[in-house]
């Protein structure tokens, strides 16, 4: 039974990716507002009802890549090594992302990645939808921080929520600054040293204000 469940889940994830990548390709070619849900369904060779079983809105078709990262910060905190604090784990993870030129850090100069970011930040409805994803990232991280605090009888849930909001905001600002510089013509490798310096400074500031998680 578990094998059948795993197979179904893999098929489901493949369908998610197929529909989303098809949609993103169309959005990049024509523009978000010029592509209908029916266009995406036809290109992906699925019916509209099937498409809506996977994606609740047109915006979600474009933001599926962000959905993959929605609980990333929470997973980093829960998966940290013994003796590592939540903030240390998040700092390490972000710096590792910079080294890999992970698109989520903004430090990626691949033409398709840059085009996707232009699509995202140039489409008001996508920016608004992204705000909801950010909120869920904060909620997931707050829950993970609260769990970490309980392990050592630390601060209450409201403190965890405040901390999560600050951490997610810092990561977003760092990523947007990296993307802004790369979009202006700098290479990812050229921006990398400054990106690391900015990240180190930002996490130092977080440590001074978020002592329970540092």
Predicted region positions:
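Short secondary-structure transition hinges
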Residues: 111-139, 152-153
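Alpha-helical transmembrane segments of multipass membrane proteins
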Residues: 168-172
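Hydrophobic alpha-helical connector segments
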Residues: 72-116
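HTH DNA-binding helix-turn interface
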Residues: 6, 30-32, 45, 52-64, ...
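C-terminal peripheral helix-coil segments that are non-catalytic and often amphipathic
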Residues: 143, 147, 176-214
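Hydrophobic alpha-helical bundle segments that form small-molecule/ligand-binding pockets
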Residues: 135-164
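Basic, helix-initiating cap at the start of DNA-binding domains
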Residues: 1-46
């Amino acid at each position: 039974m578990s094998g059948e469940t795993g197979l179904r889940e893999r098929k489901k994830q493949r369908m998610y990716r197929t529909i989303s990548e098809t949609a993103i390709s169309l959005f990049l070619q024509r523009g978000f507002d010029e592509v209908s849900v029916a266009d995406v369904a036809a290109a992906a060779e699925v019916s509209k009802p099937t498409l809506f079983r996977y994606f609740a809105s047109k915006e979600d078709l474009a933001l599926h890549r962000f959905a993959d990262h929605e609980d990333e910060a929470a997973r980093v905190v829960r998966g940290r090594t013994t003796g590592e604090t939540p903030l240390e784990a998040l700092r390490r993870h972000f710096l590792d992302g910079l080294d890999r030129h992970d698109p989520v850090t903004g430090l990626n100069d691949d033409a398709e990645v840059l085009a996707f970011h232009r699509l995202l930040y140039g489409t008001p409805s996508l920016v608004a939808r992204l705000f909801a994803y950010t909120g869920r990232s904060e909620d997931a991280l707050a829950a993970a921080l609260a769990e970490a605090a309980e392990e050592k009888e630390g601060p209450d849930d409201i403190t965890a929520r405040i901390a999560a909001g600050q951490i997610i905001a810092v990561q977003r600002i760092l990523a947007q600054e990296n993307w802004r510089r790369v979009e202006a013509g700098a290479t990812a490798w050229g921006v990398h040293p400054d990106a690391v310096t900015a990240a180190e400074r930002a996490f130092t500031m977080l440590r001074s204000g978020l002592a329970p998680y540092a």
